[in-house]
Design a protein with these regions (language model features):
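Signal peptide-directed extracytoplasmic domains
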Residues: 1-152
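Bacterial extracytoplasmic/cell-wall-associated proteins, especially those involved in peptidoglycan
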Residues: 80, 85-92, 103-300
C-alpha cells in the first residue's frame, strides 16, 4: 500500500491478488466503517482465510508505531544477493529464502525451459524497498516480491511484449541485460536498442554482465573478467552463444523493463564505457577508437 492510496485502488489490488472476490463490496464495507479515511501505507501479508476485519485491521495499522523490518533490494540484484541481504539483516536465512523461491516456482505455472537456469525465478522478484512484520517468513517475502513483479507487468506491457514477439521470460531476460549494463535511466532505451539491433542481424550480444553471471552459477562472485573467461563455455556466455541467454541475469527494475519494451530506435551496434555513461557507435572502427580512448583514460 503506497502513501495516498485510495480505498478504490486498494480494493482493486486486493481483488487482483485474489484476497477478495468483489472490490465493490469491499469498498462499500470499508466506507461504512470509515476505513477509507484511515488507510496507512506499508506492506501487508494477509494469510489465507483472513476475514475482512483482519484485512481492515492491517490496512489501518500505523506502521510507524509498530516494529517493522525494512529491507531494500537495489535494481539489478540477483536472487543470491537478495538472499544474502536478508541474512545480513537477520530477517531470514539465505538458505530459507532460496528454498522458498524454489518452492514458489515449483507451485507456479511457468512455461519456460529451466534446464539451464541456476535459479529458475531469477528476474521474477521485483527489486524495491519492502516493509515486513518481525515474524515474516521466507515464503511470505517471496510471495510479496513475486506478486509485486506480476503487478508491474501490466496487461498493457504484456501485450506490448507479445507485439514484439517476446514471451514474459524473454522480456525479463532482455530487461536484466539492460539493467546490468546501463549507467542510469538516461541510456537504458539506447542499450535496449543495441540488443534488438544485434539480435536482428544474428550478431553475438557479447555482454560481459552475462558472462560474469554464468562464471559462478548465478552468484556473481567475480568482479572482473579475464580474456580466458570469455572462452569458457556456459549457457550465459554471450561471447560464444548467439541470442538471448536462457534466462534473466538479475532482477530488473521498472525502468529497464520499460526500456526493453520501448527501445530507442537507433542503429548502434557497439558501446563501451565513457565519461558518465557509455559511448555508442555504429561502425566497428569507431568502436575501436572509443575503446582506445577508454583505455587511455584508465591508464592515466
Amino acid at each position: 500500500v503506497e502513501e495516498g492510496d485510495s480505498l478504490h485502488r486498494v480494493s482493486e489490488r486486493l481483488k487482483d491478488e485474489g484476497v477478495i472476490r468483489s472490490a465493490l463490496w469491499f469498498r462499500r464495507k470499508g466506507q461504512e466503517e470509515g476505513i477509507d479515511r484511515l488507510i496507512k501505507p506499508g506492506t501487508l501479508v494477509i494469510e489465507p482465510g483472513s476475514s475482512i476485519q483482519d484485512v481492515f485491521a492491517q490496512l489501518t495499522v500505523d506502521r510507524q508505531q509498530r516494529q517493522q523490518l525494512r529491507v531494500t533490494f537495489p535494481e539489478g540484484f540477483t536472487l543470491y544477493q537478495m538472499a544474502n541481504r536478508l541474512e545480513e539483516q537477520e530477517i531470514v536465512s539465505a538458505e530459507d529464502f532460496l528454498t522458498a523461491v524454489d518452492a514458489y516456482y515449483q507451485a507456479g505455472d511457468y512455461d519456460f525451459d529451466d534446464t539451464q537456469l541456476y535459479f529458475p525465478l531469477e528476474g521474477y522478484l521485483f527489486p524495491d524497498t519492502y516493509f515486513f512484520e518481525v515474524d515474516v517468513t521466507a515464503d511470505d517475502i517471496v510471495r510479496v516480491m513475486a506478486r509485486q513483479m506480476e503487478q508491474v507487468l501490466t496487461p498493457e506491457w504484456r501485450q506490448r511484449a507479445e507485439e514484439l514477439g517476446l514471451s514474459v521470460h524473454e522480456l525479463l531476460t532482455l530487461a536484466s541485460l539492460v539493467e546490468k549494463e546501463a549507467f542510469g535511466d538516461f541510456e537504458r532505451p539506447t542499450i535496449a536498442g543495441v540488443v534488438y539491433n544485434r539480435l536482428e542481424i544474428d550478431m553475438l550480444l557479447q555482454f560481459c554482465s552475462s558472462v560474469i553471471y554464468g562464471l559462478d552459477d548465478g552468484q556473481e562472485l567475480a568482479n572482473r573478467l579475464l580474456y580466458r573467461d570469455l572462452e569458457e563455455m556456459h549457457p550465459f556466455n554471450t561471447y560464444q552463444l548467439k541470442g538471448l541467454p536462457p534466462g534473466p541475469i538479475a532482477n530488473p527494475g521498472r525502468s529497464s523493463i520499460e526500456a526493453a519494451l520501448y527501445p530507442e530506435d537507433n542503429d548502434y551496434l557497439y558501446f563501451v564505457v565513457g565519461d558518465g555513461g557509455h559511448n555508442f557507435s555504429r561502425e566497428y572502427r569507431d568502436h575501436l577508437k572509443n575503446v582506445e580512448a577508454y583505455r587511455n583514460r584508465t591508464d592515466e
